Swiss-Prot record:
Lineage of source species: Eukaryota, Metazoa, Chordata, Craniata, Vertebrata
Residues carrying Tele-methylhistidine: 73
Record note on quaternary structure: Polymerization of globular actin (G-actin) leads to a structural filament (F-actin) in the form of a two-stranded helix. Each actin can bind to 4 others.
Post-translational modifications: Oxidation of Met-44 and Met-47 by MICALs (mical1, mical2 or mical3) to form methionine sulfoxide promotes actin filament depolymerization. Mical1 and mical2 produce the (R)-S-oxide form. The (R)-S-oxide form is reverted by msrb1 and msrb2, which promote actin repolymerization. Methylation at His-73 by SETD3. Methylation stabilizes actin filaments.
Miscellaneous notes: In vertebrates 3 main groups of actin isoforms, alpha, beta and gamma have been identified. The alpha actins are found in muscle tissues and are a major constituent of the contractile apparatus. The beta and gamma actins coexist in most cell types as components of the cytoskeleton and as mediators of internal cell motility.
GO cellular component: actin cytoskeleton; cytoskeleton; dense body; focal adhesion; nucleus; plasma membrane
Residue list for modification Methionine (R)-sulfoxide: 44, 47
Entry GO MF terms: ATP binding; hydrolase activity
Organism, scientific name: Oryzias latipes
Gene name in the database record: actb
SMART domains: ACTIN (SM00268)
Protein's UniProt name: Actin, cytoplasmic 1
Database matches in Pfam families: Actin
Family per record: Belongs to the actin family.
InterPro entries found in the cross-reference section: Actin (IPR004000), Actin/actin-like_CS (IPR020902), Actin_CS (IPR004001), ATPase_NBD (IPR043129)
EC number: 3.6.4.-
Length: 375
């Protein structure tokens, strides 16, 4: 497919926006879903200061900006900022005219219906898209792994969900959603670093903590044992250099932070951990298909990138499942982008071309068309 008519695939995550062309094997643009506004008054005339910055530019100027994420827990909370992010995606990152390309957007399962209606409306009315489609993120991850059956545990920055899919059919009654994901872990790391005497409070400092989390955290196979190791020796300590040259040391925080995925009580939440949520999701499915789901548990999303997470999932689910059950956790190396890759695959299938919602259909039916045409 040529770029001139290629469909666009935009995976709008709560934390990162991944965008590119259908048929490509990786997104061309990956940038933080952030809009930043200056905290201070501009004094130098002719500097061309803007009243808002998006993505990487906001990230690089974060010291003087207040950063806001327009998507929280997978749901758009600020549509004006969201429009800025899409505008930035089309015109600055991909450098295309949105009115010339069909666009595939992604969404978390169990999102409010109004969310996808508004997405549809903005695409057709603000950007004049010729056609669009909204796909469920976890389903795309399964496409990317080359399977038609499996349970996807997709955990990003804003939301974690488990979606069982059998022979290409998602089983909506068994989809479970957990509003605990990367951003909550970043906040938790900010909190436990404060106990060590390092203070991180502003929206800009939160980004530093996110970087610490991504570079140094890992999941312990046995939490209690690891805590013992950390207490008795300094073998687990790592140092991190802050932007001003100060060096901080972190020890048990490295695995205490992602442990909250398995023990949400760390965050004061009463929900089940990701292992139990996955198990509960499987148990909501028909008894005949559970075996196939246990053997095809696919991890996807940035929050599944911690070293050790697949082994820990294997251990925890083995403990919950029947003792003879074969359990396989699939953690593809590109899982950070597997939603986008799945979107790229889907949008370039010849059989998918009749699934697009066209501008004409939208004009006839209005935004509610999205519920009829997109699963």
């Amino acid at each position: 497919m040529d770029d001139d008519i290629a469909a666009l695939v935009v995976d709008n995550g709560s934390g990162m926006c991944k965008a590119g062309f259908a048929g490509d094997d990786a997104p061309r643009a990956v940038f933080p879903s952030i809009v930043g506004r200056p905290r201070h008054q501009g004094v130098m005339v002719g500097m061309g200061q803007k009243d808002s910055y998006v993505g990487d530019e906001a990230q690089s100027k974060r010291g003087i900006l207040t950063l806001k994420y327009p998507i929280e827990h997978g749901i758009v909370t600020n549509w004006d900022d969201m429009e800025k992010i899409w505008h930035h995606t089309f015109y600055n990152e991909l450098r295309i005219a949105p009115e010339e390309h069909p666009v595939l957007l992604t969404e978390a399962p169990l999102n409010p219906k109004a969310n996808r209606e508004k997405m549809t409306q903005i695409m057709f009315e603000t950007f004049n898209s010729p056609a669009m489609y909204v796909a469920i993120q976890a389903v795309l991850s399964l496409y990317a792994s080359g399977r038609t059956t499996g349970i996807v545990m997709d955990s990003g920055d804003g939301v974690t969900h488990t979606v069982p899919i059998y022979e290409g059919y998602a089983l909506p009654h068994a989809i479970l959603r957990l509003d605990l994901a990367g951003r909550d872990l970043t906040d938790y790391l900010m909190k436990i670093l404060t106990e060590r005497g390092y203070s991180f409070t502003t929206t800009a400092e939160r980004e530093i903590v996110r970087d610490i989390k991504e570079k140094l955290c890992y999941v312990a196979l046995d939490f209690e044992q690891e805590m013992g190791t950390a207490a008795s020796s300094s073998s687990l300590e790592k140092s991190y250099e802050l932007p001003d040259g100060q060096v901080i040391t972190i020890g048990n925080e490295r695995f205490r932070c992602p442990e909250a995925l398995f023990q949400p009580s760390f965050l004061g939440m009463e929900s089940c951990g990701i292992h139990e949520t996955t198990y509960n999701s499987i148990m909501k499915c028909d008894v005949d298909i559970r075996k196939d789901l246990y053997a095809n548990t696919v991890l996807s999303g940035g929050t599944t990138m911690y070293p050790g997470i697949a082994d820990r999932m294997q251990k925890e689910i083995t403990a919950l499942a029947p003792s003879t059950m074969k359990i396989k956790i699939i953690a593809p190396p590109e899982r950070k982008y597997s939603v986008w890759i799945g979107g790229s695959i889907l949008a370039s299938l010849s059989t998918f071309q009749q699934m697009w919602i066209s501008k004409q259909e939208y004009d006839e039916s209005g935004p509610s068309i999205v519920h009829r045409k997109c699963f």
